[in-house]
Regions:
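ATP-binding glycine-rich loop module of kinase domains
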Residues: 2-43, 57, 65-67, 74-81
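Active-site acidic catalytic loop and adjacent metal/ATP-binding pocket
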Residues: 17-21, 113-161, 171-174
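Active-site activation/catalytic loop segments of kinase-like enzymes and analogous catalytic loops
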Residues: 159-207, 222-236
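Conserved kinase catalytic-core helix
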Residues: 77-111, 115, 122-127, 132-137, ...
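ATP/Mg2+ or Mg2+-diphosphate-binding catalytic cores
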Residues: 225-267
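Short linear capping/connector segments at secondary-structure termini
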Residues: 110-116, 179-184
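Conserved HxN/HPN-centered segment at the entrance to the catalytic loop
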Residues: 45-58
């Protein structure tokens, strides 16, 4: 859809802020945390990590200018190819490359851990390396966007949320149609072995073994998300209150119960 600014197009997918495309660039209003994110994007560019947007400056309206990554985001309903085994392996490799690129990024005090982050700090986690922030082109993952909640933590913290959204580790398992994906209720006899296989594929492609406490980390991550949504809403943040009103909080609470009940079937 066209915005109030001529020749700009509002991009879909954001829960918290509006994002506009202008030619080969993306424009977003500056936030208090924007300068530190610009440092991160500059670091990634200097390290040759080609999957993130490049920070190009500030426009005449006081908005940040980022390079536009051509393709489509993993917005719901997902395309069938977005949940293929080959794509999952490529996402694992992309996350590994991100972690390698930030391995020497200075963990400045201005970057804070998100709720429930384990204390073992290894890298600056993206913290939202999720299917809806991955850009696909020619049916392959080609980019990762939205670094707004980046913060220090262990690499497995990123891996846990990536797998939750990209595998997915969910009470509704993807069922393929000709083009898009619809979801059916999880059936252990049908889906447990598929999830187990995809977990193995991801960790093999990432290059590390799955830790024994992996599912506890996934649960910790989802519980932290619930904590964040409730706290932000209580502080008067309308975007997070909208998430509650639209059922996001209840959804994640139900997912936590589901993983506690069925997660042992995947390990």
């Amino acid at each position: 859809m066209k915005s109030q600014h001529e020749n700009e197009e509002m991009l879909t997918g954001g829960n918290v802020s509006n994002v506009y495309r202008s030619g080969d660039t993306v424009r977003r209003d500056l936030k208090e945390d924007s300068p530190k994110i610009h440092k991160l994007l500059k670091h990634l560019e200097n390290k040759g990590f080609n999957y993130s947007p490049k920070f190009l400056g500030i426009d005449e309206k006081g908005r940040e200018i980022l390079s536009f990554i051509e393709g489509e985001a993993g917005n719901y309903p997902l395309k069938r190819y977005m949940l293929s085994n080959d794509v999952l392996k490529e996402i694992a490799k992309m996350l590994r490359l991100y972690h390698e690129a930030v391995s020497d990024f200075p963990l400045l005090d201005e970057f804070k851990p998100i709720d429930n982050t384990p204390q073992k700090v290894e890298v600056l986690c993206h913290n939202d390396f999720a299917i809806y922030n991955i850009i696909f082109n020619y049916e392959k993952p080609v980019g990762i966007i939205d670094f707004d909640v980046a913060g220090p933590g262990p690499k497995i913290w990123d891996i846990a949320y990536t797998l939750y959204t990209c595998l997915p580790l969910s009470s509704f398992y993807p069922a393929e149609t000709e083009q898009e994906v619809h979801h059916v209720n999880y059936d252990p006899s049908l889906h447990a072995s598929l999830i187990k296989k995809r977990l193995t594929l991801f960790f093999e492609a990432y290059g590390e073994e799955m830790p024994l406490d992996f599912l506890e980390i996934v649960l910790l991550r989802l519980e932290g998300m619930c904590k964040t949504i409730k706290r932000k809403a209580n502080e008067g943040d309308s975007a997070f209150q909208k998430m509650i009103d639209e059922g996001h909080l209840e959804h994640y609470q139900n997912e936590i119960k589901f993983i506690r009940e069925h997660g042992k079937e995947w390990i």
